[in-house]
């Protein structure tokens, strides 16, 4: 706003859940809360992952924003300097988070190798950025000294490989052996393993994925 540009909020990754009304209500409530936060913070617009959510997001902004934008609004009470931007967030590493990164990365890579770029996973629309974030965290947790689970166990290559086998096996059991065998699940798991246990951080996961396309 200080430079006259519109401030656009982040994407709501939720998608409508057509076969579960309760889950759908939860998803819509999360989108509504996210968009209310954005417009009340001064954003001028936003975006969503699914066209079915456009009307909801538009209604929230129409309710709280009088004009076409809020560029005259300044957040004068907030002061951020360069040092603030360099602060590393503190948080916990959990086994559930470790498993989730593995599971989502394998699911996305299998879909991508099979020709899909945007993939619904756990009622969220995911793209390559999801896989990039997941695999980057996995690599960093293994190689960084603070890569320790909240229960005290070090995140190691051995732990990762064991959980990768478990998560891949769970996917095979979920979708069935035949669907697993004809899909891109094994190449996806192999790619995730290769890039995660590598001694150096690969700058771009999808470059390696492209090399595996037929």
Where are each of the predicted segments found?
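Expand to "…catalyze enediolate/carbanion chemistry for C-C bond making/breaking, isomerization
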Residues: 1-214
